Amino acid sequence: MKMMGYQNQVLRIDLRNQTASVEPLRMDFAEKYVGSKGLAIRYMYEELKPGIDPLGPDNKLFLTTGPLTGTPVPCSGKLSVAAKSPATGTMNDCSIGGHAGIRIKFAGYDMIIFENIAESPCYVIIEDDEVEFVDASDLWGKGSHETEAILAEKYGIEYSIMSIGPAGENMSNMACINSDYYRQAGRGGIGAVMGSKKMKAILIKGTKGVKVPDIKKATDRILEILHDNVLQEDNTFIYDVGTTAFLEACNDGGIMPWKNFSDTTDVQWTEYNGDVLIQHREGKRGCGSCGLGCGNFLKIGDAICEGPEYETISVAGPNAGIRDPYSIVKFNMVADDVGLDTISAGDTIIWAMEMTEKGIHDFGIKFGDGEGMIRLLKEMGNRTGVGADLADGVKIASEKFGGTDFAMQVKGLEYPQYEPRGSWGMSLSYAISDRGACHLRSYA
C-alpha cells in the first residue's frame, strides 16, 4: 500500500560493487514509525547485526526523509543520517538541515542506504533514476569547503552536496558530515562511518517533486499556521540573531558552562553575545521548508562561518575560558572544514586544557588559548601530534591519560553546552538518551 507523503522507494547503493537497486519502502515500518528518525532506527534494527564493527563493511549509512519532506510544511526539510556509532557503539541518528533531504525526496526516494566499502575513494552522484560512481582520489585529503566548492563548480548548484573532511577520512570518532557548505550531521562519528566506506561526497539532484492531495488547501493551511504560530514577535529573534539568543537565557538560568562545566555563568557574556556577533554579519539564508531562516553568515578577519550556533559559541567561548568573537568564528570555520563535530571536538580540547592546568598530563594548551584550539582541531582531524591522542574523544583519551572525573561524556558522546546541574530535564536526557549525552532528546 502506498501512503500519500511517501515516494514508496528505497535506493540501495553497494559501494564495493558499484551497483544501485530500488526496492519498495517497508510501509509497515512507515505506518508505525512515523518520521525520518523512526524509519531510520527501524531499518537499522532490521538490518544491522549486534556486535558489528561500526567502521567495518557490515555497518550501513542511512539517509532518511519523512512524509512531509519536500512540502512547504515548516521545519519539514531536515534529513536524518543514521548508522551504528563508532563513538558509542549504539544506534546513532543525526539531523541535518539545508536542502539534501528535499532533493532526495524530489529524486523519488524516501531513503538511501549505503552498504559495504568502496575499493578506492569515490563520490556518488544521484540524479533521479541515475546513479554514478566517480573516482575521488583528487579530493581525498581536502577540506569539506574546498571539496564542495570544486564539486559545485563542476556539476552546478542544483545539487546538494554532502561531504567529509580529513577527520572523516581518518575515521575520528567525532567526525561529521557537511552538507550545502555549512550544515552538519554532527554527532556520534557519523562522518567516520562515511569515511570508512571511502566515500568522500554524495551529490543529490531531484526533479520529480512530491504529490499533495489538495495543494491549494494545504498551502492555505500552511500559510495560516505560519502567520498565526511562527511569524510572531516572540519568534522573530531567531531570524535576527539565530540561536545566539540562547546565550542570555542560558546564562541567566545558570546553565551556560564555564571552563569545562566548573561554573554555570559568565558575568562578561555580553562580550560575545548575539548583539556583538551580528555586527559582523555578511548575509543570511534559511534551510528548505523553513519559515524563519536563522542562518547568519559572519566574517571577522579571515574567519567566516554560517552561525555560529549557541553550542559552538559556548564550546569555543566560555566553556574554554574564551571571550573573543574572532576565536569563536575561526573555531567554527576550521572545525567545519576539517569535518569535526564542534561539540565533541571542543569538549575534548577543553578537557585537555584542564588536564594541563591540573598537571595530570601536558597537552600544550590551557584555558583561554584560542589559537591552541585551532591548532588542535587541525591535528585531531589529521591524527597528527597531540591531536592523535584526542581524535577519538574524551572517553578514550581520559581512559588513557586519566582525568575521567572531569571527562564530560555519556556512553562516549561528549556533553552539549547545557549545564545539567541547572536543568533536571536536561540532566535526565543526558543520562538516558539512546545516543549518549544529547540535548535534542530533551527540551532544547
Where do the model's predicted regions map?
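Extended C-terminal regions of large enzymes
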Residues: A152-Y155, Y159-M162, P166-G188, M194-A444
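Protein-protein interaction/assembly regions in multi-subunit complexes
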Residues: M1-T236, D240-W269
